[in-house]
Swiss-Prot record:
Belongs to the chorismate synthase family. The gene is aroC. It comes from Desulfitobacterium hafniense (strain Y51). This reaction introduces a second double bond into the aromatic ring system. NADP(+) binds at residues 39, 45. This is Chorismate synthase. InterPro entries: Chorismate_synth, Chorismate_synth_AroC_sf, Chorismate_synthase_CS. It catalyses: 5-O-(1-carboxyvinyl)-3-phosphoshikimate = chorismate + phosphate. It holds the Pfam family Chorismate_synt. Reduced FMN (FMNH(2)).
Length: 382
């Protein structure tokens, strides 16, 4: 499978094309739209989210609610385009002077993109914007729906925002609280502190980052491979996660803490049960060993830096005069950590489904479903 996205933050549309999705898989448009709406939520979101009402239009590759095997084309309308139509026009009528950016923002693609492509900063930030992730959520939700049909569940939580850290549990009641929370946390006291911290950041013209966790449940062992570097599933998941705007680090299972312990304290002892097959007594590896799933939940943690647009701007250099000035200010969020969690779940889903289709090549849903359950039976009896 593969996909491409196109579109600018303030252009007319975001578009995406997926190829390699088996035919006969059930796809529900409303479920995609619900994921897009989740991405727009969060206490720290900016004014743009009051304008956009993201919904996907499926242009091809799905008929009667089932994939056809043909490329799937998607589009999402940018409602804010109405306010930028003259500025972002493709032809000679484009107003290139309005909203021109000559003071690049530290931490953003502005300056480096300007130098690399020898183009205006406006052109750089329009494509580099996290607005692009709306289409990646739509694309990834197709993978989510196929994974759920196989019994694979992807869930996530926010572990910290700024200096506020959550107390995490692993109970059904805890995950219900996470799902109901605006912040996607299950710690009520910690959540109160998040609102206080958000207000402080907003009043100071600051932004906030955080740490997020994704869990992929009910995967079979053997997805990915150890035989070549580019087939290792943790490497591919790491690339997918780090490709999301503002994500600066990724870890699996125990992560960086593994470097502070003896091997006997890190590696997960193996057990066997006639009903479930092989299993681990712990999951410090985060469900991946040797670049392959081992049957335990895949646990991914990622760190999101604070958004680089600051309403109390840092210093920068004027591209025309070379004078030191304040960086430009674009409309932005104070905190988008819960929204990033939605994006990470969907980019991870795409990589997981791709690994499944490499293990079980299939042109149709029925072939994939049969191969998955045949292998599941083999693993449990081995």
């Amino acid at each position: 499978m593969r996909y491409l996205t196109a579109g600018e933050s303030h252009g007319p549309k975001l578009v995406g094309i997926l190829e390699g999705v088996p035919s006969g898989a059930k796809i529900d448009k409303e479920t995609i739209d619900q994921a897009l709406q989740e991405r727009q939520k969060g206490p720290g979101r900016g004014g743009r989210m009051k304008i956009e009402k993201d919904q996907v239009t499926i242009l091809s590759g799905v008929r009667g609610g089932l994939t056809t095997g043909a490329p799937i084309a998607l589009e999402i309308i940018n409602r804010d385009w109405a306010n930028w139509e003259k500025i972002m026009a493709w032809g000679d009528e484009a107003d290139l002077e309005s909203r021109k950016v000559i003071t690049p923002r530290p931490g953003h693609a502005d300056l480096t993109g300007h130098l690399k492509y020898r183009t205006e900063v406006r052109n750089v930030l329009e494509r580099a914007s996290a607005r692009e992730t709306a289409m990646r959520v739509a694309i990834g939700n197709i993978a989510v729906q196929i994974l759920e049909a196989l019994g694979v569940e992807i869930r996530g939580q926010v572990l910290s925002v700024g200096k506020v850290h959550m107390n995490s549990e692993d109970t059904p009641e805890y995950w219900q609280r996470v799902q109901a929370s605006e912040w996607k946390v299950g710690d009520p006291q910690g959540e109160e502190a998040l609102y206080t911290q958000l207000q402080e950041a907003r009043s100071k013209g600051e932004s906030l980052g955080g740490v997020l966790q994704i869990q992929v449940q009910n995967l079979l062992p053997g997805l990915g491979s150890y035989v070549q570097w580019d087939r290792k599933l943790d490497g591919r998941l790491a690339q997918a996660v780090l490709s999301v705007q503002a994500i600066k680090g990724v870890a699996f299972g125990m992560g960086f803490a593994a470097g502070q312990h003896f091997g006997s304290e890190v590696h997960d002892p193996i057990g066997y049960d006639s009903g479930r097959g092989y299993y681990r007594y712990s999951n410090n590896a985060g469900g991946i060993e040797g670049g392959m799933t081992n049957g335990e939940p895949v646990i991914i943690e990622a760190v999101m830096k604070p958004i680089p647009t600051l309403y109390s701007p840092l210093s920068t250099v004027n591209l025309e005069t070379k004078e030191v000035m304040e960086a430009s200010v674009e409309r932005s969020d104070v905190c988008a950590v819960p929204a990033a969690l939605v994006v990470l779940k969907h980019v991870a889903a795409w990589e997981i489904l791709q690994a499944i289709l490499e293990k079980f090549p299939a042109d149709t849903w029925d072939e994939l479903d049969k191969a998955w359950h045949d292998y599941k039976r083999f693993v449990s009896e081995r």
